[in-house]
């Protein structure tokens, strides 16, 4: 087949497609002539360009991968979530102080508080030359039957002092107290009747010595006072019998069961501050008459002392101290505040005798030459008698074995209490420029604690809580549980669905770095469901927080609570709620079940846990992922991790007393929070997640006195009420409604939408249907056949065209009849 034949064949293919296609415009352009053909061609090209633009918009929308969030309220059976509760106080104060690392952290915090208080300016009141003597209540220590005022005494006593010294807040070093006796040995009496008035002057007496407390009292209505010589008479205002006795024989006491005339029954309890509901009366031989108000007692505030001051104040004269020493074979050890140039000898620490009276430090010996023993007796100066049979003695003492001289020290609180914690460091009293190993260690530890330059109490307490976390992290698992609360002490009562639950078996305990022992309800129970909504059918707990065991670093009393899925790790420090003591804290919860689409529509992950996820036993969530990423970064950058998170793989967390690693942790945490992209973290949302929204409300608890459960035996009902409000809390966690909100993501524009819109645009602008697409396919197939046939010698059979043959026959007949269509 030649070129002309190929050309003719292709022309026939095009003509055949143009004549028979169902698409709009193409047949019209072919059969038309002149300007009509150009008009139809222009119209076809315009429609083709419009279709191309619409097709581009359709494809662009399809590639955006838009999603639709369907919201539906479903009424189905709901699983009750896991509820984790923790005490706001992480560890018991008494147990925590027995461990060295925690004790050091607490004492450093207390010392920082002492220093911050020392910077507060206070004006000292001038003392009057003619001050009056008044009684004052304070603490005393007993020595051979004599009582002496002492800030850290253990005997409650009453002393005599000057009036301006007894003001609250005056804690001068030159305060004078004398005539001190046990408080129970003093009596409260009537001194005299105020001149020209119906008022009484009271005083305190020990044997024959009485001191006016400058308190004026008045009898209640309708009682009236009168004086009959040396006697004091009491009678109603109306005419009635008078009761008269010597004024000195009336005593101020507590009373009860008072009638409307003011006559009462004397109470056996002589402490005027213990009984809240008792009255105050003046009594004589069982005849009591009520007076207004309660007797106010003067009390001296115990001053806060620095740690080394507390040790120094225990003994009057002699005690053992650590000091910098210059030790030689010829002269032995000599205490020095300025080190000798021979650093090998002067940069050592030894133990010395320190005389508080003349501030002399001598003699001194190396620490191995001292021995902790038991002595038979010690005097008030602090020196003790050396005993050859220490096992039979009871007083703890520290002895210099070369000279057999001993001083009294505190006994060890636990087996791991070191001598370093019970002996004063002389550089705490008079800082030195030397840098002995002990001093260096102490300075590094103080630097790591981060209290330097911080004066605000809130900032100090926040730093102290962080130091506690670091200190506790160094303990073993057994030691952590030893100082933590247990389930039976913390959770007093529990009910779920209106039925009592088993505290021992239904709660799972774990150690949280911030809140210590926490207890989770719901993990063991699996499919735990509610029968009804409302507080009565949810989880109800009565907890006992034990405020008396709170650490000084704890700011608030109460419970920390978080609601989460049963397979997730709870994070009470960031995702929790606080419930105070003395209230019923109600937490109404609602469930949102979320189903997200993965890529390319969304950015969720079906299984996000990797080998770097530090909460290995829990399900994946974004909070755990972020903490894992930060912990990984800290472990690789600083060589250790943050103890607020579990360790990363085989690495360990940073120690509390290393200032350089603590500083590294601090700096890298700032980097992690400000620019997390540098860490390479990719924490995506899980594709399936249950989210619990919580609403909070509270009311006073208990409402009235009456329930004595949980209170010490023998406690009165009104005291039990106050006891529970101070030490306990009621927690309620419940579903507000037994339905949940389902949020389901679905693709907004899929393949079906693409094909539908694409076909619609083709039909609108081009009149194209599926048949037209088939015609185009057939056209290209015919062209392909024509090209193949051109290489063969066999001639391709001619195709018949209805419209072409009709037009040719019409032209022939018209020419035959004499018509010329072209003219």
From Swiss-Prot:
Residue intervals passing through the bilayer: 39-59, 768-788
Topology feature Extracellular, residues: 60-767
Glycan attachment sites: 228, 326, 347, 415, 486, 527, 546
Membrane topology summary: Multi-pass membrane protein
Listed GO CC annotations: dendrite; plasma membrane; postsynaptic membrane
Catalyzed reactions: Na(+)(in) = Na(+)(out); K(+)(in) = K(+)(out); Li(+)(in) = Li(+)(out); Ca(2+)(in) = Ca(2+)(out)
Regions of this protein lying in the Cytoplasmic compartment: 1-38, 789-795
Gene3D superfamilies in alphabetical order: Acid-sensing ion channels like domains, YojJ-like
Tagged with keyword Transmembrane: yes
GO molecular function: ligand-gated sodium channel activity; pH-gated monoatomic ion channel activity
Pfam families recorded: ASC
Quaternary structure note: Homotrimer. Heterotrimer; with other ASIC proteins producing channel with different properties.
Record PANTHER family: AMILORIDE-SENSITIVE SODIUM CHANNEL-RELATED, DEGENERIN-LIKE PROTEIN ASIC-1
Domain statement: The second transmembrane domain (TM2) is a discontinuous alpha-helix disrupted by the GAS motif, which forms the selectivity filter by adopting an extended, belt-like conformation aligned approximately parallel to the membrane plane. This peptide belt encircles the waist of the channel and divides TM2 into two discontinuous helical segments. The distal helical segment of TM2 interacts with the cytoplasmic portion of the first transmembrane domain (TM1) from a neighboring subunit, contributing to the structural and functional integrity of the channel.
Protein name according to UniProt: Degenerin-like protein asic-1
Organism phylogeny: Eukaryota, Metazoa, Ecdysozoa, Nematoda, Chromadorea
């Amino acid at each position: 087949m030649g070129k002309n034949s190929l050309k003719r064949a292709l022309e026939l293919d095009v003509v055949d497609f143009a004549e028979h296609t169902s698409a709009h415009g193409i047949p019209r352009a072919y059969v038309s002539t002149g300007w009509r053909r150009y008009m139809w061609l222009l119209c076809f090209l315009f429609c083709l360009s419009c279709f191309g633009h619409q097709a581009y918009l359709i494809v662009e929308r399809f590639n955006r991968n838009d999603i639709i969030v369907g919201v539906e309220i479903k009424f189905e059976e709901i699983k009750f979530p896991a509820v984790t509760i923790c005490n706001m106080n992480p560890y018991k104060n008494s147990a925590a102080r027995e461990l060295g690392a925690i004790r050091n952290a607490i004492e450093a915090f207390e010392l920082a508080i002492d220093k911050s208080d020392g910077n507060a300016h206070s004006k000292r009141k001038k003392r009057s030359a003619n001050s009056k003597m008044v009684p004052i209540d304070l603490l005393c220590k007993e020595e051979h039957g004599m009582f002496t005022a002492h800030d850290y005494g253990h005997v409650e006593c009453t002393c005599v002092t000057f009036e301006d010294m007894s003001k609250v807040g005056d804690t001068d070093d030159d305060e004078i107290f004398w005539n001190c006796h046990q408080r129970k040995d003093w009596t409260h009496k009537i001194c005299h009747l105020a001149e020209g008035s119906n008022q009484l002057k009271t005083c305190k007496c020990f044997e024959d010595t009485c001191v006016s407390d400058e308190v004026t009292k008045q009898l209640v209505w309708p009682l009236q006072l009168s004086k009959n010589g040396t006697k004091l008479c009491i009678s109603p205002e109306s005419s009635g019998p008078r009761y008269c006795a010597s004024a000195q024989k009336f005593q101020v006491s507590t009373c009860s069961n008072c009638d409307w005339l003011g006559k009462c029954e004397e109470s056996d309890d002589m402490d005027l501050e213990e009984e809240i509901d008792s009255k105050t009366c003046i009594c004589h031989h069982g005849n009591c008459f009520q007076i207004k108000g309660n007797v106010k007692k003067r009390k001296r505030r115990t001053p806060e002392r620095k740690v080394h001051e507390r040790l120094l104040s225990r003994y009057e004269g002699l005690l053992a101290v650590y000091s910098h020493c210059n030790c030689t074979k010829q002269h032995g050890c000599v205490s020095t505040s300025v080190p000798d140039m021979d650093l090998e000898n002067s940069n050592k620490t030894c133990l010395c005798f320190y005389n508080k009276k003349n501030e002399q430090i001598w003699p001194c010996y190396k620490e191995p030459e001292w021995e902790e023993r038991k002595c038979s007796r010690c005097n008030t100066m602090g020196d003790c008698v050396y005993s050859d049979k220490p096992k039979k003695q009871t007083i703890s003492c520290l002895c210099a074995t070369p000279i057999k001289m001993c001083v009294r020290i505190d006994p060890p609180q636990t087996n791991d209490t070191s001598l370093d914690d019970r002996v004063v460091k002389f550089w705490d009293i008079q800082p030195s420029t030397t840098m002995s190993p002990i001093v260096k260690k102490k300075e590094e530890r103080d630097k790591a604690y981060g209290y330097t330059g911080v004066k605000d109490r809130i900032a100090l307490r926040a730093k102290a809580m962080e130091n506690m976390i670091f200190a506790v992290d160094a303990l073993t698992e057994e030691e952590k549980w030893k100082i933590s609360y247990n389930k039976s002490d913390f959770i007093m009562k529990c009910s779920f669905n209106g039925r009592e639950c088993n505290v021992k078996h239904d709660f799972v305990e774990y150690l949280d770095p911030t809140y210590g022992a926490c207890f989770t309800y719901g993990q063991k129970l699996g499919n735990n469901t509610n029968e009804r909504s409302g507080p009565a059918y949810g989880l109800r707990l009565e907890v006992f927080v034990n405020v008396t065991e709170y650490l000084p670093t704890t700011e608030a009393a109460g419970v920390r609570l978080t609601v989460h899925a049963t397979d997730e790790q709870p994070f009470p420090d960031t995702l929790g709620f606080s419930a105070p003591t003395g209230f019923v804290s109600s937490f109404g919860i609602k469930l949102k079940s979320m189903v997200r689409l993965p890529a390319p529509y969304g950015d969720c992950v079906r299984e996000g846990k990797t080998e770097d996820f530090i909460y290995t036993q829990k399900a994946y969530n974004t909070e755990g992922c972020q903490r894992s990423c930060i912990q990984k970064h800290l472990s690789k950058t600083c060589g250790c991790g943050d103890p607020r998170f579990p360790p990363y793989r085989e690495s360990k967390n940073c120690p509390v007393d290393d200032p350089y690693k603590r500083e590294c942790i601090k700096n890298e945490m700032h980097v992690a929070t400000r620019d997390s992209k540098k860490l390479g973290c990719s924490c995506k949302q899980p594709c399936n997640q249950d989210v619990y929204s919580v609403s909070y409300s509270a009311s006073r608890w208990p409402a009235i006195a009456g329930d004595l459960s949980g209170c010490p035996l023998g406690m009165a009902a009104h005291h039990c009420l106050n006891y529970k409000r101070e030490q306990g809390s009621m927690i309620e966690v419940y579903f507000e409604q037994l339905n949940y909100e389902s949020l389901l993501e679905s693709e907004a524009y899929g393949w079906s939408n693409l094909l539908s819109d694409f076909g619609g645009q083709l039909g609108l602008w081009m009149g194209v249907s599926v048949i037209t697409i088939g015609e185009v396919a057939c056209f290209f197939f015919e062209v392909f056949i024509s090209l193949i046939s051109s290489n063969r010698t066999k001639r391709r059979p001619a195709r018949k065209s209805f419209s072409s043959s009709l037009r040719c026959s019409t032209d022939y007949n018209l020419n035959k009849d004499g018509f010329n269509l072209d003219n």
